[in-house]
Amino acid sequence: MKGKGKFNARTRRHLRVRKRISGTTSVPRLVVNRSARHMFVQVVDDTQSRTIAYASTMEADVRALEGDKTAKAKRVGELVAERAKAAGIEAAVFDRAGNKYHGRVAAVADGAREGGLQL
């Protein structure tokens, strides 16, 4: 009999995390989606179901960066913090979407903090 698998484990972790956190207008949710190659980060207001700011590694200036995926993830965190601050957001709740807080996910959080966003 096979085990439950990595994907199902991540899904279960995400459901546990989402039970406890949600974004409001004043303190939205910073959501990190991670694929094998790219990172997608959104600042979401759950009360209005609206995306306030967005950044990803697919943007031209991030793609042009030299370095590994972790360095690009950190730059994405800085970009989303810059865009959130331009929209008037000072603090956010970090939603790792069931991913482990390690590597690229942690780099996004570090970049957002360095960009001036309080997590």
Swiss-Prot record:
GO biological process, alphabetically ordered: translation
InterPro entries with a match to the protein in the record: Ribosomal_uL18_bac-type, Ribosomal_uL18_bac/euk
Gene Ontology MF term list: 5S rRNA binding; structural constituent of ribosome
Disulfide bonds: none
Keyword DNA damage assigned: no
CDD domains: Ribosomal_L18_L5e (cd00432)
Keywords per UniProt: Ribonucleoprotein, Ribosomal protein, RNA-binding, rRNA-binding
Protein family: Belongs to the universal ribosomal protein uL18 family.
Record note on quaternary structure: Part of the 50S ribosomal subunit; part of the 5S rRNA/L5/L18/L25 subcomplex. Contacts the 5S and 23S rRNAs.
Protein name (record): Large ribosomal subunit protein uL18
Organism: Micrococcus luteus (Micrococcus lysodeikticus)
